[in-house]
Amino acid sequence: MKMHIARDSIVYLLNKHLQNTILTNKIEQECFLQADTPKKYLQYIKPFLINCMTKNITTDLVMKDSKRLEPYITLEMRDIIQMMFFRTLQKHTFFRENTNLCTEYVQKIEASCYHYTYQQQEKTFLEEYSTRCGMINHIINCEKKSHQQQDNDALNKLISGELKPEAIGSMTFAELCPSAALKEKTEITLRSQQKVAEKTSQLYKCPNCKQRMCTYREVQTRALDEPSTIYCTCKKCGHEFIG
């Protein structure tokens, strides 16, 4: 009986904000069917209630997700994600000295990722949410490998206030890391423009027919500071191999 009263109350609260009885009943019923205990039911329905009350979910957004309705991003999981962002930002002196600001930024960054994910259709909610949060966490990490230290554009802009934490979740890699994106684009352009003219040489032995009559070409398939990859073709048997 208590569970029935609780469900009626939740339906009333959801419908009050969504103003869509059919959609409200569909959300509530899906959460109820997924849960095998009252505790899990409340755990599943809570994100919908909170987002509706704070006007972070519109009818259109929920209808886009109505085919999958995955309320598995619980508050506990969101807390874990926020803790991940908090630990990452705390690695930087600026945020260690400004704990309150760090907490505010963490909440806004996570919320930005969460709301962005609601609008995606290609992947399931959980997969998209986890992937985006992981990407953002890597980008704002000040303890990157030495060759990535110059790519802290997003973190520096976050500290200076140029980048708003509530906007970070919907930004592309190129927008967050213009230096790294430009470097990557330059490498791709250079690779596409490189000369791939074939040369003949007896330096390379064919592993198939054991002859040393091969043509070869050099291709820059890795980073620019690493050696080129040499592709060989045996003129005797036509076998292709890497020199």
Swiss-Prot record:
It comes from the Viruses. Gene3D superfamilies: 2.20.25.10. Keywords: Late protein, Metal-binding, Transcription, Transcription regulation, Zinc, Zinc-finger. A zinc finger (TFIIS-type) spans 202-242. Residues 77-201 form the TFIIS central domain. One of its GO terms (molecular function) is zinc ion binding. InterPro entries: TF_IIS-typ, TFIIS_cen_dom, Znf_TFIIS. GO terms for biological process: DNA-templated transcription. SMART domains: TFS2M, ZnF_C2C2. Zn(2+) binds at C206, C209, C234, C237. Belongs to the TFS-II family. Putative initiation factor. Necessary for efficient transcription elongation past template-encoded arresting sites. This is Transcription factor TFIIS homolog. The lineage of its organism: Viruses, Varidnaviria, Bamfordvirae, Nucleocytoviricota, Pokkesviricetes.
